[in-house]
Amino acid sequence: FENPDQAVDTLQAAGISIPKVQISAGLRLPQVSKADIARIKLFDDEVYLHQVVAKTAYGMERYPDLGDAFASFKEAEKPEWRVHFHVPIFLAELDGFTTTRPAVEQFLARQAKNSVTDHLEVETYTWDVLPEEFRRDDVVTNIVKEMRWAQQQLGNGSTP
């Protein structure tokens, strides 16, 4: 739920350099419902932990993995979830879920205007555990799509 501009401003104001930024997007569920829970279970693999931050009327709640978030879910609270499941940055949505791509776009716009770092790394490592319907293209094709999308966002010929 952090704002990329505020995070960069805070680090720079403290005199902390930013040697590298990892560019990745996660899943965003604006108002989690029981139907969302059923659908997101497709993303609950046994390979990686997928931490969840839930924003409720009571504040932020953090869960070490999707299963923990499922167990604590209360539909009446209508929480917003951010799920640490790296999804392709070129996708604005997956299976009806939005992604945190707007934060990536915000950061890359800032990077294009006023360089924050010399080292950008596109970091999607979950290709093999994405639900089957999102694995139509091979990994190399998808990585190329991500790199091209990032370059377009930078708009100045920079390469991530």
Descriptions of predicted regions:
Residues 1-78, 82, 87:
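Acidic/histidine-rich catalytic cores of soluble enzymes
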Residues 14-16, 157-160:
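Secondary-structure transition/capping motifs at alpha-helix termini
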Residues 61-158:
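Flexible, acidic glycine-rich loops studded with aromatic residues
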